Amino acid sequence: MNRGSYASVSERQPAPPESTAAAGEFYDEMWERYGHLDAASPAAFHRRRLIVELCQRHAGGARHVLDAGCGRGELLQELRRALPGAELSASDVSLASVRETARLNPALRVFQMDLSRPDFDRVHAADLGRFELITCSEVVEHIPNDRRAVERVAKLLAPRGLLVLTVPGGKMSRFDELIGHQRHYSSGALLELALGAELDPLEVLAWGFPFQNLYRSAVRVASRFSMPSPSEPKSRGSSRNISDLLGASYAVFGRALKPLFYLNRNFWGEQMLLVARKR
């Protein structure tokens, strides 16, 4: 397996705010503007499918499960169906996401969690060592100190607990920069994150060849011409227009591409997935 550089793409995007309140507000706004794109994206659909398959294969008997970085709860819904005997919890730094997920899942525990806050261990002391399975999908690429973030997720795992982590690979698009990506990853970088958190990797997948890669290349080209760079001023109106345009494109092309994504392979792809066990 290729052990590439730690951050395989240069870190061009300014860091999102460090404080929990400011970071939460940033991602509240991102979900408001662009959250609907996730529902139409074939990449997001198949990413959730792969996560569920990995959870069932490696941790089907887990009793306590956390979806760390739950967004609006799409993955959580699929985990509920796939792991009917588990006690599920969910967390996110975005308070709007926490409230929406709690509204849709009133029987579940849903709470705000900021993996960057200095007093993380004190705030989440009751959950340290609690979960046999944690999913953390498309989260740590947003966090300036991703090593520390993964170490903190690992602290929440029970002994021999399992982490299923996903991050993007390949080059960043302008859209990635706008929504706060700090970096993208290689297989080697993902392995380093796991080992640095004292997790033993069980599987590392670079899924998506060829159709995910082609799809991501198209997104990079489209966003270069349709979106402002992160350094340019942007109005809410222009962002909403861009979001609507992308949403319409996703709805049309996503429906056509979704079946093709079943043919993607677990190598040379730009969707990185890690399964790792706590020592």
Positions of predicted regions on the chain:
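Short aromatic-enriched loop/helix-cap "lid" or pocket-rim segments at secondary-structure transitions
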Residues: 123, 175-179, 213-219
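Conserved N-terminal segment of class I S-adenosyl-L-methionine
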Residues: 1-129, 133, 137, 147-150, ...
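Short, electropositive alpha-helical surface patch
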Residues: 218-226
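Residues lining the SAM
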Residues: 137-140, 166
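Conserved S-adenosyl-L-methionine
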Residues: 199-210
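Conserved beta-strand signature within the Rossmann-like core of class I S-adenosyl-L-methionine
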Residues: 161-167
